A protein has these predicted regions:
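Low-complexity, Ser/Thr/Pro/Gly-enriched N-terminal "stalk/linker" regions
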Residues: 1-48, 59-72, 80-83
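Generic, ordered loop/turn and secondary-structure boundary motif
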Residues: 38, 84, 121, 146-148
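Short linear capping/connector segments at secondary-structure termini
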Residues: 42, 85-91, 148-152
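Aromatic-rich carbohydrate-recognition surfaces in CAZymes
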Residues: 46-50, 57-141
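Flexible glycine-/small-residue-enriched beta->alpha junction loops
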Residues: 138, 142-146, 152
Length: 152
């Protein structure tokens, strides 16, 4: 596994590459075959940390693995544009956080800045559009946006 971080051949850059490579290995070890990235292997998954992890592997040059993370978001998105707050956990969870839903915009922009892939933006734009609509649906008459919705 090699990283496109630094082309310098000095001890400091080699040291940094090894640190980043360990970060990447850990994140990739937490990624399921369906693209979901859990907190730890065989642990919970929340959309916010999932997107954070996708951005981490973006920076480290793992484009296909990152795209797989967005595929997970796409396939697990609810019809109202949201995601549940937690996945792969024993307790039933019906909470849908508005900040989790809109955070896909940050992740997609980050991915684009790293890889300049407009096809990626076009592909996942419908998910982003739905997610933003869900977030805006939480806006109150005072202009603020409720933190979360519970489907119950």
């Amino acid at each position: 596994m090699s990283l496109p971080i630094s082309k310098k051949n000095n001890a400091k850059s080699i040291y940094n590459k090894n640190i980043y490579l360990n970060f990447a290995k850990y994140i990739l070890n937490c990624q399921d075959s369906d693209g979901g990235i859990r907190w730890e292997p065989s642990s919970k998954l929340d959309p916010w940390d999932h997107i954070e992890s996708a951005m981490g592997i973006d920076v480290l040059g793992f484009e296909s693995e990152s795209k797989k993370a967005y595929e997970w978001l796409e396939s697990n998105q609810e019809t109202d544009g949201s995601w549940y707050s937690l996945y792969h956990c024993p307790e039933t969870n019906f909470l849908k956080e508005t900040n989790f839903s809109s955070y896909i915009a940050v992740g997609m922009w980050h991915h684009y800045l790293n890889f300049k892939d407009k096809k990626f933006l076009r592909r996942f734009w419908p998910s982003l559009d739905l997610a933003i609509k869900f977030t805006l649906s939480g806006q109150t008459k005072y202009g603020d946006i409720s933190w979360a919705k519970d489907q119950e």
